[in-house]
């Protein structure tokens, strides 16, 4: 096993416990990130469907608005001067809200009407009905544009977050967890090798102690035998000396 395929750590029981704890944390984090990615993916697909639906509806609304504008121009003539004379401030404004999806903040744009209708009396002389229809159609178009902008902003935000989350999930699944597993295997193999070496060392020590004990027992036996032989020789010498004296007298 190459050193780059595992974490640089000294093999010990404490290191093994630490790596098992890190493995449990990485596995739990992988599961949580996977659930987050799935939740974001579901919301992503939902927003994508709404974008397609809104764009389809947007085409129809803009077509009706363009047709209404043509009707107004045909009925009342050029209304540019009327609009410019009555314009003061925007009637449709936007407020921003926030939505939280699995820890991701998504901006939401909502249109609202502020103040009175500036062009309420415009076109009463002629073409008032067509002008009212034109205002209604373009207000619907503006609201759809705001809704579409909100959806597309959320779409882009979710797309970026999903890519980052998937990269983290893949990194944990294919890099971090396998590296921790290889580190644990390395620690276990090194500890087993140390245990075998310790067992062999203890066995050699026991063998040496056994040999030393046998040598000591053998030496004591020899010394005891020599002592017994010396005592027997001494007794024999005493007996021999006693016999010689009897012969002389």
Curated annotation (Swiss-Prot):
One of its GO terms (molecular function) is proton-transporting ATPase activity, rotational mechanism. GO terms for cellular component: proton-transporting V-type ATPase complex. InterPro entries: V_ATPase_D. Pfam families: ATP-synt_D. One of its GO terms (biological process) is proton transmembrane transport. Keywords: Hydrogen ion transport, Ion transport, Transport. Belongs to the V-ATPase D subunit family. V-ATPase is a heteromultimeric enzyme made up of two complexes: the ATP-hydrolytic V1 complex and the proton translocation V0 complex. The V1 complex consists of three catalytic AB heterodimers that form a heterohexamer, three peripheral stalks each consisting of EG heterodimers, one central rotor including subunits D and F, and the regulatory subunits C and H. The proton translocation complex V0 consists of the proton transport subunit a, a ring of proteolipid subunits c9c'', rotary subunit d, subunits e and f, and the accessory subunits VhaAC45 and ATP6AP2. NCBIfam families: V_ATPase_subD (TIGR00309). Subunit of the V1 complex of vacuolar(H+)-ATPase (V-ATPase), a multisubunit enzyme composed of a peripheral complex (V1) that hydrolyzes ATP and a membrane integral complex (V0) that translocates protons. V-ATPase is responsible for acidifying and maintaining the pH of intracellular compartments and in some cell types, is targeted to the plasma membrane, where it is responsible for acidifying the extracellular environment. This is V-type proton ATPase subunit D 2. It comes from Drosophila melanogaster (Fruit fly).
